[in-house]
Design a protein with these regions (language model features):
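Phosphate/nucleotide-binding beta-alpha loop and adjacent structural elements of enzyme active sites
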Residues: 2-317
Length: 317
């Protein structure tokens, strides 16, 4: 019901049915992610952290490995000389005898089948010099190198000799033992060019022998070079390890260090009847070796290509 106003006039009627409603108040959206959204991203985040950690560790490991490898190659190219160890040191002799000397046979492999043995030309000559001596003693340095026959195999298998076979090259050493030289000993080593033991780098490409005084300039950086460490013992130390002081035949092939090896021998303490030395150097080097052996009471008797035969004067008949 409409009530009259003071002037008897009714006020205008207002209706709200067609007026628009005010918009509802809006809620402020939170800018931070919710816990549920974090749970959805957690596996991916964990993977990224783990991947980054693994890659960091891998890079550090690779850098350390490369550094260690380089240092190893540097050490492999460096000769170790045991200056304080005399060639007649009792501990050295015991070490050679108990650790390095072994029978010249390979029990786990079938012996190599070869024709002969037949004496080489220089061996046949030496047999005549020694009047077909039986049961002699030899030392052969460089036996079976590069597939060559041993100059002492005929002496051992046909004339009952025995002795020591020296071979520094690993492959040739194992082939040596397959020749079934049961009367002799073998050693995987080289003859030292100094009157004390040393450890050197053996370059597999040096097929003529161990280049003791030469280190290849590309040894550290050149991956085509395969190097191994080889121990070198003085000739006199090896004789003491075998309990001998007298040798009928010494065959010396050491790839360029023959003179230095001969200079380490105390000729006043050992007796070597015949020395067959390989000389592949120039004429001046040959003359130097000849003069040295002549000074040690040897006389030059005959040459066979690069092999030169010397004999101790007082042993000649």
């Amino acid at each position: 019901m409409n009530l009259p106003t003071r002037n008897g006039v009714n006020p205008p009627t207002t209706t709200t049915q067609n007026l628009p409603l005010p918009p509802p108040p809006t809620k402020m959206r939170h800018m931070l992610p919710t816990i549920s959204s974090l749970k959805n991203f957690l596996p991916a985040l964990t993977f990224l952290v783990a991947f980054a950690t693994v890659m960091t560790v891998l890079v550090i490991h690779m850098n350390n490995t490369a550094t260690r490898h380089h240092q190893f190659l540097v050490n492999m190219s460096r000769d170790n000389e045991f200056l304080g160890v005399a060639q007649d040191n009792p501990e050295l002799i015991t070490y050679i005898r108990e650790v390095h000397l072994s029978p010249a046979v390979e029990p786990h492999h079938k012996p190599l089948e070869t024709l002969g043995p037949f004496p080489t030309e220089d061996t046949a000559y030496i047999i005549k010099l020694l009047n077909n001596k039986k049961e002699g003693i030899f030392v052969e340095a460089g036996a079976y190198s590069d597939g060559k026959v041993s100059k002492t195999e005929y002496l051992e298998k046909r004339m009952s000799w025995h002795g020591l076979l020296i071979q520094p090259e690993p492959t040739h050493y194992f082939k040596l033992k397959r020749h079934n030289r049961g009367r002799s000993l073998a050693i995987h080593a080289c003859l030292s060019s100094t009157p004390y033991p040393k450890e050197i780098t053996f370059h597999q490409e040096d097929r003529d022998g161990v280049k003791i005084n030469q280190i290849h300039t590309n040894t550290v950086e050149d991956p085509d070079w395969f190097n191994t460490r080889v121990k070198c013992f003085p000739f006199y130390s090896l004789l003491l390890a075998m309990n001998i002081s007298s040798v009928d035949l010494f065959i010396l092939e050491s790839g360029g260090t023959e003179l230095q090896v001969l200079q380490t021998i105390p000729f006043d303490r050992v007796s070597i009847d015949i020395i067959n030395v390989q000389i592949q150097a120039n004429d001046s080097e040959k003359d130097t070796i000849k003069k040295f052996l002549i000074s040690k009471n040897y006389t030059f008797t005959q040459s066979f290509n690069s092999n030169h035969v010397f004999r101790l004067k007082h042993s000649q008949v």
